[in-house]
A protein has these predicted regions:
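ATP-hydrolysis module of ASCE/P-loop NTPase motor domains
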Residues: 100-107, 124-221
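Hydrophobic residues in alpha-helical segments
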Residues: 40, 211-212, 230-231
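Short basic/glycine-enriched coil/helix segment immediately N-terminal to the Walker B
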Residues: 230-241
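A short structural micro-motif
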Residues: 17, 181, 229-232
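P-loop NTPase Walker
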Residues: 1-129, 141, 214, 238
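N-terminal alpha-helical segment
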Residues: 3, 32, 203, 219-222, ...
Length: 241
């Protein structure tokens, strides 16, 4: 399958954890993709029990496409007894469509943000927010431009602060930094220094309420809320283990 000896050992490893240490461009993604295909094709692994995390959405798409092709090649040989390249285009499309329905669609391949968003689509209704806020499974996701626009609206319209002295962009960064530390507004306020820090915590509190009112999450929430949900709910933790 075009793998070197080290890649083949990684692909064939079956029981227990395996750590692969290799530099950029050495074929780690290739080995991982072949390993997933090997686990499904040779060991009958359940696709829904396989998790692969990438840094970018592009890498996730490419991994899924490669995997579909590898599994379609296997299926062509087992079902038709002939190489993939000799199949008519219509049968190739049918095989890839079948692989997508039965395998690719069930796999958990994506970035941390994408995978956690998928998790929240299942279980966000079980999340108990410390400030009593709620979201439904149909939540929308605000990109950075949406988030900055909302913070600016709170700073300039709700609190009527001078945006030149209390910059919305810096405030948004401070809120993002707080979320990445796992802090809610009360924790940010407790660690704040001076009036500016107190105001930032106030903006953060209003920002969260505005997000919830719009049934929206920002990118930081996609990491923070799942962690909090898993910490607080044993049933959810057991399900996703």
């Amino acid at each position: 399958a075009g793998l070197n000896d080290a890649q083949r050992r990684a692909v064939d490893h079956h029981v227990g954890p395996l750590l692969v240490v290799a530099g950029a461009g050495s074929g780690k993604t290739r080995a991982l993709t072949h390993r997933i295909a090997h686990l499904i094709g040779e060991h009958g692994a359940d696709p829904a029990q396989i998790l692969a995390v990438t840094f970018t959405n592009k890498a996730a798409r490419e991994m899924k496409e490669r995997l579909e092709f590898l599994l379609a090649q296997r299926l062509a040989q087992s079902q038709y007894g002939q190489p993939w390249s000799t199949l008519p285009p219509v049968e190739q499309r049918q095989l890839r469509s079948r692989i997508y329905r039965e395998v690719t669609k069930e796999l958990w391949i994506g970035t941390f943000h994408a995978l956690f968003a998928r998790m929240l689509r299942y279980d966000i209704d079980k999340f108990k927010d410390a400030e009593g806020l709620t979201w439904t499974k149909q939540f929308s996701i605000y990109d950075e431009a949406d988030a900055q626009s909302l913070v600016k609206e709170i700073v300039t319209q709700e609190l009527q602060l001078d945006p030149k002295r209390f910059e919305p962009k810096k405030t948004r960064w401070a809120i993002s930094n707080a979320k990445n530390q796992g802090w809610l507004p009360d924790q940010l306020e407790a660690n704040a220094e001076g009036q500016r820090g107190k105001l930032t915590a106030d903006v953060y509190r209003r920002y969260r309420k505005a997000l919830a009112a719009n049934n929206a999450l920002d990118f930081d929430d996609l990491l923070l809320l799942p962690v909090q949900l898993l910490q607080q709910n044993e049933q959810v933790r057991s399900y996703w283990h």
